[in-house]
Swiss-Prot record:
Region of interest: Domain B: 594-721
Subcellular location: Nucleus
Tissues with expression: Ubiquitous.
Underlying gene: RBR2
Lineage of origin: Eukaryota, Viridiplantae, Streptophyta, Embryophyta, Tracheophyta
Gene3D superfamilies: Cyclin-like
InterPro entries: Cyclin-like_sf (IPR036915), RB_A (IPR002720), RB_B (IPR002719), RB_fam (IPR028309), RB_N (IPR024599)
Protein name: Retinoblastoma-related protein 2
Region (Pocket): 274-721
Keywords: Cell cycle, Nucleus, Repressor, Transcription, Transcription regulation
Positions of region (Spacer): 476-593
Biased composition (Polar residues): 841-850
Compositional bias annotation for Basic and acidic residues: 523-539
Length: 866
């Protein structure tokens, strides 16, 4: 690479660029739909017939929005700001576009229903239609007016001073008018000028923003908007391929209709909850419920903090300022010696970042007070000092509040888990606060509950098992038998950075706080951390909330069941205690023991649901419990199989292993073909599985293999005892009838020699190479009777048969595959409220079923939520 070549884009930069494309595509879809509701699709008199059939007025408004976006950086950071900008553009078009191009008349219009004494209130009507904030919309219109003045050298006039047909019966008090902006004589030149300006100032030169508007392939279809789109992720590098993001902009929620409206008695149409409506609905909640709260802790919360062993009010408020400044830095990278650009996560616009910090802090104080009130009602809590002085607890709650705010605005430049990295946390840390957050914020919209549920699933299935997760710091205490493996692969998390470290990292100075490091600020370990704690003092234990939505822990030992039953009494403060600290209500057990039991219970619940769904899809429901039991035993006794891996990889292997020992007609290919239909499927789960080992020099090396190789080399040796137990327990009828002393599961001995297979074919004239099909008789000879039932043979493919030419091409493509990364992402299907409640906690505090096996019950049709 030459010195002038730009550095290769990181995965984070690519992810942000992909998300930007999806955001703009969704914004353009909203704009086209709104424009077509307000204006006719007729082309102007001077507009030539084009292949795109995009009216020039629509194109002019789109370029005006793009120019506004370039001038105001906050417009490209989240979907809510984009919608406010586009609604401002629509207001300007309504003022300037000739009235004959409207689809409505002012009298009795359903589009403009807000009235004043002077006529229709245009801004209030648009805010009502599109759930926007009048204050934000006014700010956007002011920015748009300034942009028009600078671009076209025009002076804004008060609309009340202008006499034009467009403004008839409209209240013009708060509106501005530009003479000549869309007049016939100069409109074409104005359109060309602003389009040229947008192209020349486009810092994302790879993207054709006009194509995003004009190409229908860029516009996500409403029918496809059925899955989660909190992060607006894309399954492939859209900013490079310019592919349609239709299948990747997903929303997991559809608002069902009620049979009859109680007000008018008419049937109500089903409302499709798109990313736009979802974002505007949650933004309305944030604006009306959270933003109206006081900036500082309430008097009740201040009383609770001051009543501790020492007054913690200053420490709490100082921490909020520092952590939120680290998450939403207002200093650009240029100020720190870096460079600005689209993908710079530290280039937050000051006004935008300050608004997000204010929202997150208010939400944090609100939930913190609710948690404190609930803890005081716990019979085991008579002092809030341990909880309110716990650094990790506060950071997790702050990070969760910030993530909810970002999810509300559909932000693309700061995505999960970037919030955790900025706060010095790991995903396992966040998993301990999610349920408490949802339980104690009763007004949280359903969309945000589903967002947090999807985060919890991501953490459980893979993120918590990644290298550097604080899970291993608890696991090494709770399961000493895996300590050597954890240390061998260097899986332990680093110490949590202190607040001073965050200040130094961001080079920030909080107004009103001392510029010098404060001795009160937390260091890497918490104030109540045990000095014998491992490398990273991960302070977690059982939460009283978790009990209500978890299945009973696996009954591998009696004391685990007893512990789980009495865990309802565990105070939240023990959840964040150091792993080596004794559980205050658990006798001789450590906090790490209870923490791992809780986490494993969540894993088992998620696995039970996925095993049931997969077995039902394959139509082997009778094997569901066996697969689950094998998975449960592996999680308990072969926990190292999960290190650096995805739980679906173990589920697939368990299913195939059970099928082998039970002699079912089920191949890996069939399992994978059905797994690909699952909502959470992504190709790298079965194409790239981590295997770590040391070479002859003792150097740790890692390689990634497909699932069949992993199954044969790693899974079978570790899981064989559990699979053998299925045979010994009589899983097959013929096993019970076997009286010959033969190894169960082995083929019957035959008195005749095996018949030869077909004559092999010579495949090369110059080489003595012959190829013949792999027959069952050959397979029987290659594998011993005791092991034949466990292994997968090479003849079993992971892809469905197509044709010889296509299969050979696919083989060559895989042989030439140089990278591990598979362009895909997790998409979470819509889940029922019962599943969400089971994972996040019942709103009324009730408990759910305590048996994970309950997930095996046959699926029944779920009625839509009303």
């Amino acid at each position: 690479m030459s010195s002038q070549d730009p550095p290769p884009a990181t995965s984070t930069q690519k992810k942000q660029s992909e998300s930007l494309v999806n955001l703009l595509a969704e914004a353009s879809r909203f704009y086209r739909k709104a424009y077509n509701e307000l204006f006719s699709g007729l082309i102007t008199e001077w507009e030539p017939e084009s292949s795109t059939n995009i009216p020039d007025y629509m194109l002019f408004g789109w370029h005006l929005f793009l120019n506004l976006r370039l001038r105001s950086p906050e417009l490209f950071k989240d979907l809510v700001s984009c919608i406010h900008g586009l609604v401002a553009v629509l207001a300007i078009l309504l003022v300037h576009v000739p009235a004959k191009f409207r689809t409505f008349t002012i009298e009795g219009s359903s589009h403009l229903i807000k009235q004043t004494e002077k006529g229709v209130d245009l801004i209030a009507s648009l805010c009502h239609n599109y759930h926007t904030s009048e204050e934000c919309l006014k700010e956007m219109m002011d920015k748009s007016h300034k942009a028009i003045e600078e671009v076209f050298s025009m002076k804004a006039l008060s609309a009340s001073e202008c006499k034009t047909e467009n403004l008839d019966k409209i209240d013009t008090d708060r509106l501005m008018y530009f003479k000549g902006l869309i007049d016939m004589e100069c409109f074409q030149s104005n359109l060309e000028k602003i389009e040229k300006l947008c192209n020349s100032n486009n810092c994302e030169a790879e993207l054709d923003f006009k194509l995003i508007l004009t190409n229908n392939d860029y516009i996500p279809c409403a029918e496809n908007l059925s899955r989660d789109s909190t992060n607006l992720g894309c399954s492939k590098c859209a900013f490079e391929t310019l592919a349609s993001p239709r299948k990747t902009i997903k929303n997991m929620l559809t608002v069902p209709s009620s049979p009859l409206s109680p007000t008018n008695g008419c049937s109500v149409k089903i409302v499709q909850m798109t990313p736009i409506t979802s974002a505007m609905t949650t933004a309305k909640w944030l604006r009306e419920v959270i933003s109206s709260l006081p900036e500082k802790p309430s008097s009740k919360l201040q009383q609770l903090m001051s009543s501790c062993d020492r007054d913690l009010t200053y420490a709490v408020t100082e921490r909020v300022s520092i952590v939120l400044e680290a998450i939403f830095p207002t200093k650009s990278s240029a100020d720190r010696g870096g460079s600005l650009g689209l993908n710079c996560a530290n280039a937050f616009d000051t006004l935008w970042a300050d608004a997000r910090k204010m929202e997150a802090s208010k939400l944090y104080y609100r939930v913190l007070e609710a948690i404190c009130r609930a803890e005081l009602q716990n019979s085991n809590v008579n002092n809030l000092t341990p909880l309110l002085s716990n650094e990790r607890f506060h950071r997790c709650l702050i990070a969760c509040s910030a993530d909810v705010v970002l999810a509300t605005h559909k932000t693309v430049i700061m995505m999960f888990p970037a919030v955790l990295e900025s706060a010095g946390l790991t995903s396992f840390d966040l998993s301990k606060i999610i349920e408490n957050f949802v339980r104690h914020e009763e007004t949280l919209p359903r969309e945000l509950k589903r967002h947090l549920n999807s985060l919890e699933e991501q953490i459980l299935e893979s993120m918590a098992w990644e290298k550097g997760s604080s899970l291993y710091n608890s696991l090494i205490v709770a399961r000493p038998s895996v300590a050597s493996e954890i240390n061998r692969f260097g899986l332990l998390a680093e110490s949590m950075p202190s607040l001073d470290d965050l200040v130094a990292r961001q080079n920030i100075h909080i107004e009103g706080l001392p510029a010098t490091p404060s001795k009160k600020r937390a260091a890497g370990r918490d104030d109540n951390a045990d000095p014998r704690s491992p490398k990273r003092p991960c302070n977690e234990s059982r939460s009283p909330v978790v009990e209500h939505n978890l299945q009973t822990p696996p009954p591998k030992q009696c004391h685990m069941v007893l512990t789980s039953l009495k865990a309802k009494c565990h105070p939240l403060q023990s959840t964040f205690a150091s792993p080596t600290v004794s559980n205050p209500v658990g006798g001789n057990e450590k906090c790490a023991d209870v923490t791992i039991q809780i986490f494993f219970s969540k894993i088992l619940k998620l696995a039970a649901i996925r095993i049931r769904n997969l077995c039902e899809r394959i139509q082997y429901m009778e094997q569901t419990e066996r697969v689950y039991n094998v998975f449960k035993q592996i999680l308990d006794q072969q926990t190292t199989l999960f290190f650096n891996r995805h739980i679906d990889q173990l589920i697939l292997c368990c299913l195939y292993g059970v099928a082998k020992v039970c002699q079912l007609e089920l191949s890996f290919r069939e399992i994978l073909n059905n797994y690909k239909k699952e909502a959470q499927c992504k190709p790298e789960v079965f194409l790239s599985i981590y295997i770590g080992s040391r070479n002859h020099n003792g150097v740790l090396i890692s390689r990634h293999v497909d699932i069949i190789t992993f199954y044969n080399e790693v899974f079978v040796p570790a899981a064989k005892p559990f699979l053998v137990s299925l045979i010994s327990s009589g899983t097959r009828p013929e096993d019970k009838k076997n009286a010959s002393g033969q190894v169960p599961g082995s083929p019957k001995l035959s008195p005749f020699p095996n018949l030869p297979d077909m004559s092999p074919k010579k495949v090369s004239a110059s080489h003595n190479v012959y190829v013949s099909p792999l027959r069952q008789t050959k397979m029987d000879l290659l594998l011993s009777p005791s092991s034949r039932s466990f292994y997968a043979c090479i003849g079993e493919g992971t892809h469905a048969y197509q044709s010889p030419s296509k299969d050979l091409a696919a083989i060559n493509s895989r042989l030439n595959y140089n990278g591990r990364r598979v362009n895909s992402r997790l998409n979470f299907d819509m889940v029922s409220d019962s599943v969400v409640a089971g994972s996040l906690g019942q709103p009324n505090g009730g408990s759910t079923s305590l048996d994970p096996a309950a997930a095996f019950s046959p699926l029944s049709k779920r009625k839509p939520d009303t």
